Amino acid sequence: MDAAEGSIVIKAPVAAVYKRWLAFEDYPKFITAIKHVRKLDENHFSASLAFNGKQHKATLEMMLRVPERRLAWRTLADHRAPDHLAAGVVSFASLSDQSTCVTLKLTSSFGGAVSRRIGTYLQNFKALIEDEAPKEDQL
């Protein structure tokens, strides 16, 4: 199992950052290994992933939601890929009215070198959030 943890400070209020992370269908915009996400129900999602030259499909289960604080999820065992398991936790800490620390922890058996990619995922998420924020001259 490959495991990694990383943190980043985002210039946005915790409520906005948390809400954006809940937009599961947008994960491919910042987690480059995820190619497509489809919501199945309130707590389950189908995901298509690609890394190491291979395509993978997984069903993700949201296990924990603490509004504006924490989310946790895992992949469910599947007959197509019984040995491919992953889990993640993302925590949100308000540093000020306009600043949030995001900490992401990922564990994966997919062999995608999560430890090398976690920083990129967080940087991509930060860019997504901060690029969407209204600029002062737009207010």
PLM feature segments, named:
Residues 35-36, 48, 76-78:
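Short, solvent-exposed loop/turn elements at beta->coil junctions and helix N-caps
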Residues 59-64, 72-132, 136-139:
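Beta-strand/loop substructures that line and gate deep hydrophobic ligand-binding cavities in soluble
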Residues 50-54, 82:
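Short strand-coil-strand connectors
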Residues 7-11, 38, 48-50, 61-63, ...:
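Generic structural detector for well-ordered beta-strands
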Residues 1-44, 124, 128:
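Hydrophobic ligand-binding cavity/cleft-lining segments
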Residues 21, 47, 73-75:
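Tryptophan-centric aromatic hotspots in well-structured domains and transmembrane helices
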